[in-house]
Amino acid sequence: MKITKIEKKKRLYLIELDNDDSLYVTEDTIVRFMLSKDKVLDNDQLEDMKHFAQLSYGKNLALYFLSFQQRSNKQVADYLRKHEIEEHIIADIITQLQEEQWIDDTKLADTYIRQNQLNGDKGPQVLKQKLLQKGIASHDIDPILSQTDFSQLAQKVSQKLFDKYQEKLPPKALKDKITQALLTKGFSYDLAKHSLNHLNFDQDNQEIEDLLDKELDKQYRKLSRKYDGYTLKQKLYQALYRKGYNSDDINCKLRNYL
């Protein structure tokens, strides 16, 4: 087969053959196989060229994908599949990228966890879930998590939540709110409870009463549209109790309110 045409198309070259076949190749392919117009290729040479062309093209795609941020082996492989790179070529590309240290799942997991320690708010359970979603194996994640101290991060997150809600909730409800938020963010129950020890939940009676008055007004506006009489009183009591207010304080307020 003879090459009848070589035409540059943006980042690729169009190769046309005298058997009406055509293919796109990278500049690396042109150089490696010393391609030029009128060059004759046998079947083996053509197959070698096609394999190298897809390998070169796929690797360039992968490097472009990696130029934005670190990626896992799986993320790179999935990206190449979207661009219709063949599976055996993908395997070769992944191997090359690993050997050249462009991709490293263990390093990616370590960087991800360290960045979270600096400016994130996730606990180990959520971090592991997110890394697994990236296709990183547990054996690359677990050793790093086990060596990472999350106590200071839990304290920082709990302090931020405390500052946000301390003027809106009574002590019991505030503790429950912070604990639940930490659990949702992936911290263990023990770590969540321990982080509360560094916070001051003391509120004087007037502060608690003011919060109760405000919440009672809010719940009354909401519930009085649907209920009245004894049923309204019961609904108000239940709503306030769920918010963490003391039963005696609630009953006292309701007697004077209704």
Curated annotation (Swiss-Prot):
Biological processes, Gene Ontology terms: regulation of DNA repair
Annotated protein name in UniProt: Regulatory protein RecX
Assigned keywords, A-Z: Cytoplasm
Broad class of where this protein is predominantly found: cytoplasm
Gene from which the chain derives: recX
InterPro entries to which the protein is assigned, alphabetical: RecX_HTH_1st, RecX_HTH_2nd, RecX_HTH_3rd, Regulatory_RecX, WH-like_DNA-bd_sf
GO cellular component, one term: cytoplasm
NCBIfam families recorded: PRK14135.1
